[in-house]
Design a protein with these regions (language model features):
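Membrane-interface helix/loop boundary segments of multi-pass membrane proteins
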Residues: 110-135, 167-174
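Juxtamembrane helix-loop-helix connectors linking adjacent transmembrane helices
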Residues: 2-23, 44-110, 120-125
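Alpha-helical transmembrane segments of multipass membrane proteins
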Residues: 1, 26-36, 66, 70-74, 76, 105, 137-146, ...
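Membrane-interface helix caps and helix-loop-helix hairpins in membrane proteins
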Residues: 83-90, 143-152
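Structural signal for the C-terminal ends of transmembrane alpha-helices
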Residues: 36-45, 168-171
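Functionally important transmembrane alpha-helices
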Residues: 154-176
Length: 176
């Protein structure tokens, strides 16, 4: 198998809910590992990863709202420019949608802790903020290389989003 064929097979398999849903929820172990490593190996408080207790729920909900606004804008722009269309379907499984939504919340939080909470702050503690943002943004983009449809434009968009998320975190000093 070539790398391209391997990625296609992995994408086909991982698209099945019985594989995808547990995979999304299991990313919480990446968060716990990053926290453990930060605390026990680097001897830094978890707070150094941007995990602020005060107002965490409010900040997290604001982050979700920002994400919904950004994704809605992308969707609407793609419809306006004829790239995608929106269709209403009957027989929607709202339970499955809720499971996926919860899974993507966990997976998104895990990516934040790994790439911005841990990696960006670890690099930033020894080097400039610009280098820390650049390294964590590029790592974030490359971590999605096995995603279906990944190409140079997808990498650029992921890196740009990661720069935005990094600057947002640096401005608020809060991962939530």
């Amino acid at each position: 198998l070539t790398v391209k064929e391997s990625i296609r097979v992995a994408s086909d398999i991982s698209g099945e809910p019985r594989i995808m849903l547990p995979s999304l929820y299991c990313t919480v172990f990446g968060t716990l590992t990053a926290m453990f490593y930060c605390r026990m190996v680097e001897m830094r408080p978890v707070r150094s990863m941007g995990a602020v207790k005060k107002g965490a729920l409010r900040s997290y909900l604001i982050g979700i709202a920002v994400g919904i606004v950004l994704m809605s804008a992308i969707t609407l722009l793609s419809v306006l420019f004829g790239v995608n269309s929106i269709a209403v379907r009957s027989g929607i499984n709202f339970g499955m949608i809720a499971l996926y939504f919860g899974g993507f919340l966990v997976q998104g939080m895990s990516e934040e802790f790994i790439f911005r909470g841990y990696l960006m702050n670890s690099v930033g503690g020894k080097h400039s903020a610009a280098l820390a943002v650049g390294i964590s943004a590029l790592a974030f983009g490359l971590a999605h290389a096995a995603n279906p449809g990944f190409n140079a434009l997808a990498l650029l968009n992921l890196v740009l989003f990661a720069v935005f998320a990094s600057l947002y975190m640096l401005n608020s000093d809060n991962i939530w």
